């Protein structure tokens, strides 16, 4: 289900004094070079499909590169796009840092860059035109706010295990930051175990097994994405515990599999992160090529879903 997009009140930026060229396709067709993080999760697969389908529908030629979770692969892909003289470059950064050099190369080549899903930590914001994606800090806050509300009638200590996303990635850093920002106000909330599980189901299970071996007093699992949460559910069940009851589970993304797990009582709450960015990305790409002003930040509007909403919402999940 596509969510509407909210445009922040950031100042508008112009792509260039003149319209950007259409790229090296040899026609008037716009060429978009896109470097994807990888295919590490159901969310990412849905994101890729959304971009591919939207490009075809918009008549935009898409040059697609899968970075396989490696920054060096993305840098290589961006340099290839520069050499190919594409009209626009878009990418979802594997990690937040280390992009200035290659983005400066794109800027020098007068090829505008769009960030999708994830941000970069560059101090020079002129290196990209806009950032389209979720507010990951707010997602972390929403996850924590649910836990605070669910725990408000007890003064007992709440022991939390955290499955982090890829180390150094914007969603992992920001979802942790937002969550801690909220729970840090009450000393009864304690993170007793926290480790990366690389946003994958297999690692989610593996790391959760280690958590359970070291800590038999975990009350809550906070997973930075659904795939890690679903892997952790397997580990919890194999340990003879009931996910959603013995250990409450908070996850982020909103995939169909997670909604099914919520409907089954195994996940307690999911904070939505919408992967269907393709149509908006193509709209932005056309604006950039035409030289139209573009907001510096475009934030997706997303919800929070609990078990009592899961069954009704499940048929609407398209990913």
List where the protein language model places each region.
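Extracytoplasmic "Venus flytrap"
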Residues: 31-58, 62-80, 84-86, 92-96, ...
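Short, solvent-exposed amphipathic alpha-helices that sit
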Residues: 43-58, 139-146, 170-189, 203, ...
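Short beta-strand elements at the ligand-binding edges of bilobed clamshell
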Residues: 64-66, 122-148, 162-163, 194, ...
